[in-house]
């Protein structure tokens, strides 16, 4: 009742301001209408992702956002386990004005922390309405609760995959020395690492080179250790589950065909010295430091997971020690569907809490970020500084481009370009604005412009223009009707959450044990792992989650 009453008062006041006023025009400029207010205001914000480059909106983009909206964010970003911090926020009753909880939205909804944004969007957010169009139905929370609690910011609208930022990574120098061989299977990938280490066991300073390292620090274990078992066996990224495309039934992916063999390969890499012995004990900063040292030949990660380490290499001019992305599968019998289209996933995003003193100002702020002006500002920066317009086309000047490539951390902190992507709704790659320019810089010509000489040399050897050319095209696969199940929220009081935590703990313990075991011990550990999953109730969890997948399909497609 507290939430409803507070919202009603604010909405009534806002509607009274609108009385007798017209909308003015059909323009999508964000600061239109009689309730536009750009007086200085600070909104508190919590984000479940870390953000090392956050500069308190004192970057160029942030200052312009404040100029246009009057809003400054007093932001806190997660530095450790965001789930624990969000649980504390939910229990406290003291919420930030804006919150981006990622997969823990259910905790806040159950606590009554979140405002239903449906009427706010309808009355005050023309750009958000325009952006999502007929896909706005996907913003609904569930079949039972059609409220809109967040503006999706982690999933772009109408985009296509131009960027291959995942797969298996290899240093350019290693691939070059191997003669640019075909790299399609785990064996191909292993061969490049092995041959390079045999010739170069140490770096120029006598430090031992590392064949491959993994990041098993907390949730990173899913990205670099466990998810690849599904991806290399043709089960596109659905988090901890494999979804049968014919029945929409969920199976904990560790119980599916081929995954034992993947972890057996990791065990082989560990026991032959090609996998870093510290992979399962190092922290994230130690992982990044190894990448930055240039001694790690191979990675299995998303580019955002190791980019800070790679940026240090670029800043030092060591471009041949940075990484290319390869479509690697367990064997030739599998087809890589890592980039199978999810369609618009909705899901994770930014919401307004019941603690917000002025929800209208908050939604207008989010509406500006979703506007054409706001998106261009975030993606490109300031005209005349981070880009120019030549013959009607946005162009990044050469000196700016060099900073983006070789001094990216400092450039991002100063410019703010890209820092606000996960705070505002946005179009995806390949979508053009009203001037005929692409919203994002991720279109083929600009992607190529962003590549280092080492990347261009490697790609040329493979007769490819971009890394995506080395992967099967998303058009080869149907769009997944459930999107991606890792962004399906399960109510916090559902028993499957308890089971999911149990099987997660088992997996995070048993998989490293299996990888680090002696080869002759692997089968026994694997069999014990599978039995422990059953004992923990994994089958009940699968059945329960299947219902949520099928509900998602119904919610989105009927």
Model-inferred region functions:
Residues 6-10, 21-188, 200, 233-242, ...:
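Conserved N-terminal structural module of periplasmic/extracytoplasmic solute-binding proteins
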Residues 16-20:
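C-terminal motif of bacterial Sec signal peptides marking the signal peptidase cleavage site
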Residues 72-78, 278, 324-327:
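General small-molecule cofactor/ligand-binding pocket signal
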Residues 105-106, 112-140, 193-197, 207-243, ...:
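Carboxylate/His-rich catalytic cores and anion/metal-binding grooves
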Residues 147, 152-222, 244-290, 295, ...:
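Helix-loop-helix "hinge/cap" segment bordering the ligand-binding cleft or interdomain interface
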Residues 321-331, 338-420:
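Polar, glycine-rich mid-to-C-terminal structural blocks
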């Amino acid at each position: 009742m507290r939430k409803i009453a507070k919202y009603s008062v604010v909405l009534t006041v806002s509607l009274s301001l609108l009385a007798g006023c017209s909308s003015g025009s059909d323009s999508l400029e964000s600061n239109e209408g009689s309730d536009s207010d750009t007086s200085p205001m600070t909104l508190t914000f919590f984000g479940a992702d870390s953000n090392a480059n956050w500069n308190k909106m004192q970057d160029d983009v942030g200052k312009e956002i404040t100029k246009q909206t009057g809003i400054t964010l007093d932001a806190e970003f997660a530095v450790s386990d965001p789930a624990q911090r969000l649980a504390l926020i939910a229990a406290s009753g003291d919420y930030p004005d804006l919150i981006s909880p990622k997969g823990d939205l259910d905790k806040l909804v159950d606590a009554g922390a979140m405002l239903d944004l449906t009427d706010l969007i309808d009355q005050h957010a023309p750009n958000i309405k325009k952006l999502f169009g007929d896909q706005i139905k996907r913003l609904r929370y569930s079949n039972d609760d059609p409220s809109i609690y967040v503006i999706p910011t982690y999933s772009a609208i109408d985009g296509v995959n131009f960027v291959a930022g995942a797969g298996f990574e290899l240093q350019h120098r290693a691939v070059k020395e191997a003669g640019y061989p075909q790299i399609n299977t785990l064996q191909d990938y292993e061969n490049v690492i092995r041959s390079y280490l045999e010739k170069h066991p140490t770096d120029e300073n006598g430090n031992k080179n590392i064949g491959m390292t993994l990041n098993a620090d907390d949730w990173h274990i899913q990205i670099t250790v466990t998810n690849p078992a599904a991806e290399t066996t043709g089960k596109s990224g659905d988090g901890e589950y494999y979804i049968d495309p014919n029945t929409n039934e969920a199976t904990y992916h560790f119980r599916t065909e081929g995954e034992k063999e993947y972890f057996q390969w990791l065990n082989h890499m560990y026991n032959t010295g090609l996998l870093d012995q510290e992979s399962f004990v190092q922290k994230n900063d130690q992982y990044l430091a190894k990448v930055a040292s240039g001694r790690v030949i191979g990675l299995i990660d998303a580019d955002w997971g190791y980019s800070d380490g790679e940026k240090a290499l670029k800043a030092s001019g060591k471009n041949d020690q940075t990484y290319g992305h390869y479509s690697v599968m367990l064997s030739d019998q599998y087809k890589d569907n890592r980039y199978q289209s999810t369609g618009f996933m909705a899901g994770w995003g930014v919401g307004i809490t019941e603690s917000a003193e002025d929800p209208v100002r908050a939604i207008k702020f989010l509406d500006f970020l979703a506007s054409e002006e706001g998106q261009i500002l975030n993606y490109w920066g300031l005209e005349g500084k981070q880009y120019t317009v030549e013959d009607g086309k946005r162009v990044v000047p050469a000196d700016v481009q060099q900073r983006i490539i070789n001094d990216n951390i400092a450039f991002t902190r100063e410019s703010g370009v890209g820092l606000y992507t996960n705070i505002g709704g946005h179009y995806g790659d390949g979508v053009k604005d009203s001037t005929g320019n692409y919203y994002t810089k991720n279109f083929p010509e600009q992607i190529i412009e962003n590549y280092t000489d080492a990347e261009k040399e490697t790609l040329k050897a493979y007769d490819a223009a971009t890394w995506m050319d080395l992967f099967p095209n998303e058009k080869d696969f149907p769009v997944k009707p459930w999107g991606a199940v890792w962004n399906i929220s399960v109510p916090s009081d559902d028993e499957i959450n308890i089971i999911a935590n149990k099987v997660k703990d088992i997996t995070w313990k048993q998989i490293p044990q299996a990888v680090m075991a002696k080869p002759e011990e692997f089968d026994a550990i694997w069999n014990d792992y599978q039995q422990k999953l059953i004992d923990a109730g994994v089958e009940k969890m699968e059945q329960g989650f299947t219902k949520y997948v099928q509900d998602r399909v119904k919610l989105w497609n009927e």
